[in-house]
């Protein structure tokens, strides 16, 4: 699969990613001990550089962030009193809960930070081989409130496509996301959302499901993995819907998908009237809509279970009202 952002091989079949994830970020026998730099120490007290391993070529995360801080100080965007945390958030290309600091190979890290410039981002990308993208962050990307419109971060250099290994009692999936357009969710075992979904499964309720604010598709696709016969995924934000279609393809073997059909190619970033963008069939009948959840059931058949996974603190009362046509609505 070609990456929709850079056209390269950033997106791999989920089963291949899962087969290699345990060793993806592991040190080799010749790697030096992790430097474990003090993240609160000012730049002036940090070492100038940390070498890569001569055998495997991988770099400790601290080495990459130190190199990035060096460039930002050099370009006047940080000063000698700033520390490693001031660089931004390091996001490994395939997110996975690690018990150890990651060792990074080429193009395996995205940096999302504030107060960055395009020239600095391009310098980081060209001079630090482990970095695959640099994002100017601020706020929560996506559509938090349909009345206020969307928020996007800015991809300053490189590629923003990354994936997360999502684990559950049903099995694991790899969920890819365009990170400058989709909010960050750190993968963790036993997450509250998965606990809710697993509880619904054990009550026999994950059979016919609408994931009304689906984002890149995490909950809806987990319902497919859990054995649902029909799943509808919907989002008002076009980048999320495009990520859903990508994730159907990436996870199709794990989900028992035999056929994926692309029906429409919407152009409006924020939808109003729902449009059926794609379908998939096999072990489960899957429909993907780009639309406002408040209007979804004018096009899609209601389900026995409707999941609403809104941003924390959002008022969901109106959405719950329109989802009354479903047998049960659960706020995740």
Regions found by a protein language model. Give the residues of each.
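N-terminal cysteine/histidine-rich coordination modules
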Residues: 1-68
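Non-catalytic substrate-recognition/targeting regions of SAM-dependent transferases
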Residues: 102-107, 112-187
